């Protein structure tokens, strides 16, 4: 089910993200992320003491898997927004809307706002965080998940693959990502930033699964290398290194740590004398 509304300012804006979530490759990428990350994401969300029938906002909703799960588990209403909702599927009590969170936080107040792998892509993240907090109802929860560590190879198939791995990592994470405005330091700063924004009961934890060559997380890396091929080559990575990197990711002998994803969450205070 896809009932999509479009905010005028978003439709007129030119998207400048490195990856296109609404494309065919984007759909494969989003499905892989859902497979790898959703179980842990939902374990964090399930532990929150939400009110009955909560109002929720899912920022950068991707394919909508988390938004649909929130609606199903809480019986609440979920607004699922994305800059490119081409692969965003809604559902019962899930409204899909094209919207750029850099422009504003739509609607509210919310009992839950969740954003996974969103803020690290936004150079305006420091300005967006207080707006998200302001959009929470008293007692509402903000949950953020972002990448803090890059993939780390444990066992590689062939001699010489370590050099290929390192050259790819340099091009992708030292050049292409930062040029696109990505911050890999943000995840380690979220806890303190949430406290600074006035949230209470702030907690954080990290999640990092092991990748095996050819599995879903490895295919996710291959997909990203295809979407980012142009910028990677312009950053100095050779076509041969790119080809070999994809072979490594498909080789069942590979063992590597996936991205480390840090989740941080906190609650907007309830004014004295008021109940959440």
Locate each region found by the language model.
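Conserved alpha-helix/loop element of class I SAM-dependent methyltransferases that forms part
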Residues: 35-52
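Class I SAM-dependent methyltransferase SAM/SAH-binding core
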Residues: 55-57, 61-104
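A short acidic, Gly/Pro-enriched loop at the edge of an enzyme's catalytic core
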Residues: 103-113
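A short glycine-rich, Lys/Arg-flanked "PGG" loop and its adjoining helix->strand segment in the class I
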Residues: 126-141
């Amino acid at each position: 089910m896809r009932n999509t509304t479009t905010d005028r300012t978003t439709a007129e804006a030119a998207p400048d993200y490195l990856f296109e979530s609404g494309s065919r490759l984007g759909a494969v990428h989003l499905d892989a992320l859902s497979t790898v990350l959703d179980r842990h994401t939902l374990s964090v969300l399930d532990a929150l003491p939400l009110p009955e029938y909560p109002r929720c906002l899912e920022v950068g909703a991707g394919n909508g898997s988390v938004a649909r799960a929130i609606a199903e588990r809480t019986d609440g209403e979920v607004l699922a927004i994305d800059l490119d909702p081409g692969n965003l599927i809604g559902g019962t009590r899930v409204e899909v809307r094209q919207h750029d969170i850099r422009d504003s936080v739509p609607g509210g107040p919310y009992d839950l706002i969740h954003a996974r792998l969103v803020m690290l892509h936004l150079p305006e993240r420091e300005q967006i965080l207080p707006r998200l907090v302001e959009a929470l109802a008293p007692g509402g929860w903000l949950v953020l998940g972002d990448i803090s560590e890059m993939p780390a190879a444990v066992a590689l198939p062939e001699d010489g693959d370590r050099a290929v791995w390192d050259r790819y990592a340099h091009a992708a994470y030292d050049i292409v990502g930062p040029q696109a405005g990505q911050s890999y330091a943000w995840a380690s700063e979220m806890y303190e930033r949430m406290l600074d924004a006035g949230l209470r009961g702030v907690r954080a934890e990290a999640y990092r699964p092991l990748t095996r060559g050819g599995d879903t997380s490895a295919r996710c890396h291959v997909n990203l290398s295809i979407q980012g091929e142009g910028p990677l080559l312009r950053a100095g990575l050779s076509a041969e290194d790119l080809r070999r990197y994809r072979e490594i990711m498909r080789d069942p002998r590979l063992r590597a740590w996936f991205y480390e994803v840090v989740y941080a969450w906190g609650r907007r205070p309830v004014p004295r004398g008021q109940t959440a």
